[in-house]
């Protein structure tokens, strides 16, 4: 699983692909977005993963509360925001992802299924104070999956601990913005000039600590 392996090992597969396709390709744009994902995850998970072992804390719920915080900060209704619109599943996007994952034999069919599935479930679990919310929560509870699935649907009210966790995550988020910019420029040099990858890439999506 990618979350458990050093990110530089993945990038080693990608360097020759981008050199072939070019830095103006859609695949490169997708890959740079994935680098942003890597930076944000590795920074925030360093805090979230150990924090989620505390009583009453949940990994997905903490991330969801931070999503709520950011959406409200930008003036959006976090409960009903159509988050699935941020997951395109058009042919161009599917082809770009296919090029990035070509070394891993991931078919376009599987990519389309994954993206379409994400869009479907994000839309299904986005609901305000409605009968739909009541029914979904009831099904989660009677099937004993509530704890596992709770974080996939934003609660109507923020958790009591969210003010504290959001403040910490905001610091990690701000740090990630500058770090992502630095690492993107570094990766670009590794592709275009053959320079070695930044040592920060020798971490996982779970932590910002080097593996060795």
Predicted segment positions?
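N-terminal leader/auxiliary helical segments
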Residues: 1-31, 35, 39-212
């Amino acid at each position: 699983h990618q979350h458990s392996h050093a990110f530089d090992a993945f990038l080693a597969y990608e360097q020759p692909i981008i050199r072939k396709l070019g830095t103006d390709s859609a695949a490169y744009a997708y890959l740079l977005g994935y680098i942003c994902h890597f930076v944000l995850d590795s920074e925030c998970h360093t805090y979230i993963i150990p924090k989620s072992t505390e009583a009453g804390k949940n990994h997905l719920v903490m991330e969801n509360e931070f999503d709520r915080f950011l959406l409200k900060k930008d003036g959006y209704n976090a409960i009903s925001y159509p988050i699935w619109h941020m997951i395109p599943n058009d042919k161009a996007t599917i082809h770009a992802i296919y090029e990035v994952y070509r070394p891993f034999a991931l078919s376009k069919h599987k990519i389309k299924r994954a993206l379409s599935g994400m869009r479907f479930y994000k839309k299904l679990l986005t609901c305000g104070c409605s009968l739909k919310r009541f029914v979904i929560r009831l099904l989660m509870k009677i099937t004993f999956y509530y704890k596992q699935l709770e974080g996939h649907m934003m609660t109507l009210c923020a958790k009591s601990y969210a003010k504290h966790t959001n403040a910490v995550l905001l610091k990690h988020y701000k740090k990630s913005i500058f770090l992502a910019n630095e690492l993107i420029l570094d990766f670009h040099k590794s592709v275009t000039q053959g320079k070695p990858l930044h040592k920060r890439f020798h971490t996982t999506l779970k932590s910002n600590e080097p593996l060795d």
